[in-house]
Swiss-Prot record:
Broad EC category: ligase
Origin: domain of life: Eukaryota
Organs and tissues of expression: Expressed in roots, leaves, stems, flowers and developing seeds.
Name of this chain's protein: Butanoate--CoA ligase AAE1
Cross-referenced CDD domains: ttLC_FACS_AEE21_like
GO terms under cellular component: peroxisome
GO MF term list: ligase activity
Motif position, Microbody targeting signal: 554-556
Gene of this entry: AAE1
InterPro entries: AMP-bd_C (IPR025110), AMP-bd_C_sf (IPR045851), AMP-binding_CS (IPR020845), AMP-dep_synth/lig_dom (IPR000873), ANL_N_sf (IPR042099)
Length: 556
């Protein structure tokens, strides 16, 4: 409703964009350190100048509004700068998964219409291979820019084509007085993030300036990142634009500690050296920390908040992290929700619970993130909202300002994902009476044994409490009698011993018998670069195993 005397004008409406975070920090925190990577350091004033020059250079290279610029790099300074430099040129940033091979990168470059690709020296051959594939197929090949190792400039001109540009060449060719291109509509796209990439239908999730702005501020507020935090980059910057924290840390003038290789030793060393206040990562990073050798561990210099997500963390792992002194924040979301879509906000009344119970409460996925207005559990067939009884399982759905614009060049997939005015996550969960969501499984991961649903997450959480278990993943294994049974893939801690029979018995003592695994496979777990276990690989292995019923095992 428009009221008499009110108007919408440039005086009271400016499109929201994370670009404004950098503009402000370059003034307010001009001389504060923005980026640290070994001996390489920049201030916020320097960072903005470099980002403006990158935008200028991209414009000179023919990049204009709506074009796509890709980057294939780990957590290095260039990744921070490109998150601003690219949108300052009016373009979309596409951050590629560093575990992709040349053929998949080529698919994504073609699908996104990438015009320039920045490639870290460690992944240069992959980028060059992708460009060669495009060339051989007659597709337009993007301009390739090399990002050398800033600490050593490890790739010399003699070892590559003289025609290939280097990152610092791009910065140098840009002009510091370039007029930054800002969105005319805050719903304009700022980035595209690929959830998967098959040769038939890669899914490019499109983020808007508005969504990125709102989720960045929400992440800062909800994870208690007060003025000038020091953030250690242990979660991949390429994943959901670093859960929007690349922009969020900028908004409050924080310091980005860049980490190329994530190891337990590097984590403790950097926390100690730089007085880290915040960090994040998947449960695999938590496991790395709690199982680090004593020789690599160091006392925390102060409060270190750890934001975990990407996969449901076992309560036992959260408990161990807090024993080490970390303050845990648990979020849940998807690429389609800009990363975090919920957070398990702590309630004061839980303070009196035993520590183990507190960890269980914190392991729940929680309530909606700020900016994401509503989260429900619905029946995927009737689309009715299910009761908040902590028992009735349905599909988790979202709606709000931090849900993606849609899937790039895939209107049918967008329409399907948004049916009924909600984004359908594909995750199965329950809502508790207090309004908190708890995941039970991915819809494709639920195990149906003898007509009963088995939550792989519950079985995994039980296995994680065994003192010998380092990692565990549970999938369905075909069975002639039951239809499916739980099959656990387990990695034991170094020096530990446990038999399959022991672990099965351990689970049966703590779970209904039908939920306990009927088979255990000991091996390393395949993972994505974001730390998620690749269950599709394990499902294939489980299907290849001989059905237990054929061996005459007990059906009890």
């Amino acid at each position: 409703m428009k009221m008499e005397g009110t108007i919408k004008s440039p005086a009271n409406y400016v499109p929201l964009t994370p670009i404004s975070f950098l503009d402000r920090s370059a003034v307010v925190y001009a001389d504060r350190v923005s980026i640290v990577y070994g001996s390489v350091k920049y201030t916020w004033r320097q960072t903005r100048d470099r980002c403006v020059r990158i935008a200028s250079a991209l414009s000179q290279l023919g990049i204009s509004t709506g074009d796509v610029v890709s980057v294939l790099a780990p957590n290095v300074p260039a990744m921070v700068e490109l998150h601003f430099g690219v949108p300052m040129a009016g373009a979309l940033l596409c951050t590629l998964n560093i575990r992709h091979d040349s053929s998949l990168v080529a698919v994504l470059l073609r699908h996104s219409g990438t015009k320039v690709i920045f490639a870290d020296h460690q992944f240069l051959q992959i980028a060059e291979g992708a460009c060669e594939i495009l060339s051989n197929k007659g597709d337009k090949v993007p301009i390739l820019v090399l990002i050398p190792e800033p600490l050593t400039q490890s790739v010399s001109r003699k070892k590559r084509s003289e025609e290939m540009m280097e990152y610092e060449d791009v910065v140098a060719m840009g002009k510091s007085d370039f007029e930054v291109i800002r969105p005319t509509d805050e719903c304009d796209a700022i980035s595209v993030n690929y959830t998967s990439g098959t040769t038939s239908s890669p899914k490019g999730v499109v983020y808007s300036h508005r969504g990125a702005y709102l989720n960045s501020l929400a992440a800062v507020l909800l994870n208690e990142m007060h003025s000038s935090p020091t953030y250690l980059w242990t979660n991949p910057m390429f994943h959901c634009n670093g859960w929007c924290l690349l922009w969020g840390v900028t908004a409050i003038g924080g310091t980005n500690i860049c980490l190329r290789n994530v190891t337990a030793k590097a984590i403790f060393d950097n926390i100690s050296q730089h007085k880290v206040t915040h960090m994040g990562g998947a449960p695999t990073i938590l496991n790395m920390i709690i199982n680090a050798p004593e020789s690599e561990q160091k006392p925390l210099p102060g409060k270190v908040s750890f934001i975990t997500g990407a996969a449901p963390p076992p309560a036992h792992v959260i408990f161990k992290m807090e024993e080490l002194g970390f303050s845990m924040f648990h979020s849940y979301g998807l690429t389609e929700t800009y990363g975090p879509g919920t957070i398990c906000t702590w309630k004061p009344e839980w303070d009196s619970l035993p520590r183990e119970e507190q960890a269980k409460m914190k392991a729940r996925q929680g309530v909606n993130h700020l900016g994401l207005e509503e989260i429900q559990v619905k029946d995927p067939v009737t689309m009715r909202t299910l009761p908040a009884d902590g028992v009735t399982m349905g599909e988790v759905v979202f709606r709000g300002n931090t849900v993606m614009n849609g899937y790039l060049k895939n209107p049918e997939a967008t329409k399907e994902a948004f049916k009924g005015g909600w984004f359908w996550s594909g995750d199965l969960g329950v809502k508790h009476p207090d309004g908190y969501i708890e995941l039970k499984d991915r819809s494709k991961d639920i195990i149906i044994s003898g007509g009963e649903n088995i939550s792989s997450i519950e079985v995994e959480s039980t296995l994680f409490t065994h003192p010998c278990v380092l990692e565990a993943a549970v999938v369905a294994r075909p069975d002639e009698y039951w239809g499916e049974t739980a099959c656990a893939f387990v990695k034991l801690k170094d020096g530990s011993k446990a038999s399959a029979e022991e672990l099965i018995s351990y689970c049966r003592d703590r779970l209904p018998h039908y939920m306990a695994p009927r088979s255990i496979v000991f091996e390393d777990l395949p993972k994505t670069s974001t730390g998620k276990v690749q269950k599709f690989v394990l499902r294939t292995k489980a299907k290849a195993l001989v059905s237990l019923s054929k061996k005459g095992r007990s059906k009890l």
